[in-house]
């Protein structure tokens, strides 16, 4: 009995110990109350600075419920034994304004090891403070090893606080406001630091104080402002350094071998995106531990060093986007058995990759990129590769059959890019493959392969654009249930879209079929594209009304149906799409009015209804939150332009309508960048309020009936005088390029992904009169790229403007085209126009200008078109520079102009100054002659009068005869008068 009792007691004790052990293993220990209260105090502090005051928005799991275990809260990790907080992360914050963090709130967390204050919110942390302990505030956190302060507004004032956290081994300060000389002296006491990440700041200068960080193993200084190899010299003293990132700086000159070649422990070296020149240093082959070497996007030349054959640990080698030319041998890579990724391309397009036909390297690549390498045949070594995930042979001279054997040999192949070659045949693979991304655009294949859905059923992205495909749309695509991106634009497909396609591809998100010959109704009602995000069907032959085929595509953001034969009105279901921000239906036969609900869509940012038959009044306002680009030209709109229309509008094109009334005094002119009102029936004067267009680039008021004078305040228009960052536009979401990403390689700092651009940005094309013709100026809509970014112009031609040309217009320094022709302008050509140093076209023809052409205009070196014909100008035509290129037509209708290129000669051997002096002398002589004439005439009259008076004083026959005549005249006058 006693033994039984002892057995039960032992069993109970055993079970208790097991339960305690399981409780500890499963983290049942709650956080201690002191730290729970401290976390709530921290939340209270963050809430006081947050835009969102509700408990559900700021750290919602951090609650005051006593039953809530703070170890289970978001961003918190506790020690399972002690219940003390060891990891603390506050997540994304949305502050009212940038705010400092009170470090005293962290003091209760004595065992915290990792502190994450990184955020992706707005107005993040901008510093620290502690009113009690000051800079020593972090010294009490003796276990703190990792501190992440990335994506905030921290600057150098933070460093004295950080310098007290001497236990730190990892410090991350990426994407902050570190600006100026390298600040490492402020961290000299962090002698235990092993990883320091200062990526994406604005650092420069010497790194001399780095010598204090003797244990440093990983250093990332990418995306800063280092520019000289001299600034990198101190790096050679970091003998324990294993990972070094210097990508995306501005370092020029040869790669400094005295720095990098001494770092024998280097495993990762990232130098991409600099300005290094010359050959790849031979001594890099002595870095035996090197696993990652990225030299892409520099200006390197020469060949691959033979010493690279010693880099037996090398896994990642990227040499793309350099200036290699001539022969480039891959033989040094033969025995690199660990090589997994190799990239090579050249900007010169003259590189000739050399390898023996029997070359069989010992590596098995997962990624190979050989773009712009002048390849005429598929490299034979690819026959021996069996583990490829990505192959990019784009932009070469490859021809013949598409190498589908790559699929057979590499069952794990996910991405195959063969665009911009000369392939002519696409043999469909005989086996089913898991390929996901396939780009064979810009080849010469001609016939779309049959049964692609059988061989490649899992395709996610397919780009076969610009191949000359003919015939009907391939029905097999309708069986590809996973396809989300399809681009078959710029081909010769014809006929209707098959029902199997419009109902079967339910995963489609991006569909581009533009520039084909598809016909019939635009997407039948049974169309089922519920995930559709981007639809481009422009430049086809679709006819009829816009049906309801897209009515269930409520996720649609971009819709382009321009240049078809569509008719009828804009369907009302379109207004129910909550995310729609691009609508392009230009050059069709649509009619009716613009529904107000269309312009009431909150995210609408690009509307092109030009070249249709819309009529009626313009909408009174736009509700877009981001600033809309609105093209309504070449329609039949009538009535006045509403005063409120410019609010939130960045581009407004109303040319060639039937609008009347005066130019309104717009309520809001700050957002407008391009204002085009040409070819209407606008009357009245140019309002002075137009001078408030502080961000305007193009202004076209031509072909109207405007009168009055040109306001001198038009010189207030910016026309590029502001800095480019001040001219930045609000970029709506669709301008941001979204991508399909796939991670290819990951190291300490380097993450290599394939980013397949979905090209969702909109190319904006503006036609503007310059150089006496209408030219198209294209660019991305945010003016970040393209010729449109550089174009500034003003056209007031073909109106009834009068008065003189304001001299102040010469202050529009960035103006490239100015057209004031076909008006009734008087006075002279302002000499201030000589300040228009960028002007390319200056048209002042068909006015009533007088005087001479200012000689200073000959300094305009960019001037390509100059027209002053049909005026009343006189004097010598300027010569030299651009004026030597103008024809006589530029000066016709000015009979008093002389000199080349006209046939009228001026006085020889006289400079323009002498000619002016001669004219003044002639004017002086003419004045003297007139004075002599007047004096002589007066003298004759006075002499004759004196003679008559003298004769009257003597009794002579002449006097008596004269008196009889006078008496007879008096007698006859008496008979006539009553």
From Swiss-Prot:
InterPro entries: Leu-rich_rpt (IPR001611), Leu-rich_rpt_typical-subtyp (IPR003591), LRR_dom_sf (IPR032675), LRR_N_plant-typ (IPR013210), LRR_R13L4/SHOC2-like (IPR055414), RLP_Defense_Trigger (IPR051502)
Stretches assigned to coiled coil: none
Main location per the UniProt record: membrane
Parts of the chain on the Extracellular side: 28-930
Protein name (record): Receptor like protein 21
Family affiliation: Belongs to the RLP family.
Topology in membrane: Single-pass type I membrane protein
Residue ranges of the TM segments: 931-951
Cytoplasmic face residues: 952-978
Gene giving rise to this polypeptide: RLP21
Compartment annotation: Cell membrane
LRR repeat locations: 141-167, 169-189, 190-213, 214-237, 238-262, 264-287, 288-310, 312-335, 337-361, 362-385, 386-409, 410-432, 433-455, 457-480, 481-504, 506-529, 530-553, 554-577, 579-601, 602-625, 627-646, 647-671, 673-693, 694-716, 788-811, 812-835, 837-859, 860-885
Keyword entries, A-Z: Cell membrane, Glycoprotein, Leucine-rich repeat, Membrane, Receptor, Repeat, Signal, Transmembrane, Transmembrane helix
């Amino acid at each position: 009995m006693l033994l039984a009792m002892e057995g039960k007691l032992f069993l109970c004790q055993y079970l208790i110990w097991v339960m305690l052990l399981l409780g500890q293993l499963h983290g049942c220990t709650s956080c201690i109350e002191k730290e729970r209260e401290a976390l709530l105090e921290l939340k209270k502090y963050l809430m006081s600075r947050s835009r969102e005051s509700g408990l559900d928005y700021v750290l919602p799991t951090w609650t005051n419920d006593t039953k809530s275990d703070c170890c289970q809260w978001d961003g918190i990790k506790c020690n399972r034994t002690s219940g003390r907080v060891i990891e603390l992360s506050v997540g994304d914050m949305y502050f009212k304004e940038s705010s400092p963090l009170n470090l005293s709130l962290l003091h209760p967390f004595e065992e915290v090891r990792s502190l994450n204050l990184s955020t992706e919110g707005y107005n993040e942390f901008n510093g620290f403070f502690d009113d009690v302990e000051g800079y020593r505030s972090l010294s009490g956190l003796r276990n703190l090893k990792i501190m992440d302060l990335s994506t905030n507004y921290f600057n150098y004032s933070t460093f004295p606080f950080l310098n007290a956290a001497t236990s730190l081994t990892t410090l991350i300060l990426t994407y902050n406001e570190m600006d100026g000389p390298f600040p490492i002296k402020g961290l000299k006491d962090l002698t235990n630091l092993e990883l320091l990440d200062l990526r994406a700041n604005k650092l420069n200068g010497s790194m001399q104080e780095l010598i204090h960080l003797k244990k440093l193993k990983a250093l990332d200084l990418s995306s800063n402002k280092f520019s000289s190899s001299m600034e990198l010299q101190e790096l050679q003293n970091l003998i324990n350094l294993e990972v070094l990132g210097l990508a995306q700086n501005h370092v020029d000159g040869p790669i400094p071998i005295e720095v990098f070649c001494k770092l024998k422990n280097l495993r990762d070296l990232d130098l991409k995106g600099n300005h290094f020149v010359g050959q790849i240093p031979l001594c890099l082959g002595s870095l035996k531990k090197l696993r990652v070497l990225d030299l892409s996007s520099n200006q390197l030349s020469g060949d691959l060093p033979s010493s690279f054959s010693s880099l037996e640990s090398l896994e990642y080698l990227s040499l793309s986007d350099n200036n290699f030319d001539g022969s480039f041998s891959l033989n040094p890579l033969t025995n690199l058995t660990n090589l997994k990724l190799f990239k090579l391309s050249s900007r010169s397009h003259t590189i000739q990759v050399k390898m023996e036909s029997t070359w069989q390297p010992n590596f098995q690549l997962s990624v190979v990129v050989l773009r712009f390498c002048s390849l005429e045949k598929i490299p034979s070594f690819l026959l021996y590769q069996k583990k490829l995930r990505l192959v990019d042979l784009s932009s070469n001279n490859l021809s013949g059959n598409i190498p589908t054997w790559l699929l057979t040999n590499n069952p794990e192949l996910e991405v195959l890019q063969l665009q911009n070659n000369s392939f002519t045949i696409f043999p469909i693979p005989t086996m089913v493959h898991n390929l996901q991304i396939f780009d064979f655009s810009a080849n010469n294949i001609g016939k779309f392969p049959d049964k692609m859905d059988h061989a490649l059923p899992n395709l996610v992205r397919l780009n076969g654009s610009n191949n000359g495909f003919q015939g009907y749309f391939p029905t097999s695509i309708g069986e590809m249930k996973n396809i989300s991106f399809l681009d078959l634009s710029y081909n010769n497909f014809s006929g209707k879209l098959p029902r199997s396609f419009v109902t079967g591809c339910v995963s489609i998100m991006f569909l581009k079929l533009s520039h084909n010959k598809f016909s019939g109704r635009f997407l039948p009602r049974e169309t089922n594209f519920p995930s559709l995000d981007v639809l481009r069907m422009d430049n086809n032959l679709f006819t009829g009304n816009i049906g309801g085929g897209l009515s269930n595509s409520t996720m649609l953001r971009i819709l382009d149906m321009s240049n078809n034969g569509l008719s009828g009105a804009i369907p009302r279901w379109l207004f129910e799409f909550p995310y729609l921000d691009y609508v392009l239906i230009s050059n069709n036969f649509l009619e009716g009015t613009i529904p107000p609900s269309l312009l009431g869509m909150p995210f609408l940012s690009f509307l092109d209804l030009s070249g249709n038959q819309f009529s009626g009044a313009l909408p009174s306002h736009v509700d877009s939150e981001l600033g809309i680009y609105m093209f309504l030209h070449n329609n039949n709109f009538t009535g006045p332009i509403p005063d409120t229309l410019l609010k939130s509008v960045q581009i407004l094109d109303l040319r060639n309508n039937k609008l009347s009334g005066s130019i309104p005094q717009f309520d809001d002119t700050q957002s407008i960048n391009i204002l085009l009102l040409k070819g209407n029936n606008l009357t009245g004067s140019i309002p002075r309020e137009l001078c408030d267009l502080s961000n305007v680039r193009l202004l076209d008021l031509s072909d109207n009936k405007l009168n009055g004078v040109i306001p001198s305040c038009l010189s207030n228009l910016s026309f590029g005088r502001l800095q480019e960052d001040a001219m930045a536009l609000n970029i709506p979401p669709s301008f941001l390029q979204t991508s399909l990403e796939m991670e290819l390689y990951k190291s300490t700092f380097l993450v290599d992904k394939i980013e397949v651009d979905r090209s969702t940005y909109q190319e904006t094309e503006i036609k503007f009169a310059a150089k006496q013709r209408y030219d198209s100026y294209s660019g991305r809509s945010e003016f970040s790229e393209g010729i449109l970014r550089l174009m500034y112009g003003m056209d007031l031609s073909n109106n009834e403007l009068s008065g003189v040309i304001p001299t102040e217009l010469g202050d529009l320094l960035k103006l490239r085209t100015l057209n004031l022709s076909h008006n009734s302008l008087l006075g002279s050509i302002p000499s201030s126009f000589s300040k228009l140093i960028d002007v390319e076209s200056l048209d002042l023809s068909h006015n009533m200008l007088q005087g001479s052409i200012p000689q200073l205009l000959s300094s305009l070196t960019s001037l390509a078109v100059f027209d002053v014909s049909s005026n009343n100008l006189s004097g010598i035509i300027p010569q030299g520079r651009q004026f030597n290129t103008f024809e006589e037509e530029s000066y016709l209708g000015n009979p008093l102009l002389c000199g080349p290129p006209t046939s009228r000669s001026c006085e020889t051997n006289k400079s323009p100054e002498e000619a002016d002096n001669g004219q003044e002398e002639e004017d002086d002589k003419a004045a003297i002659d007139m004075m002599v004439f007047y004096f002589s005439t007066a003298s004759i009259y006075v002499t004759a009068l004196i003679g008559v008076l003298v004769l009257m004083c003597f009794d002579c026959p002449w006097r008596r005869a004269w008196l009889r005549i006078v008496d007879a005249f008096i007698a006859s006058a008496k008979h006539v008068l009553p």
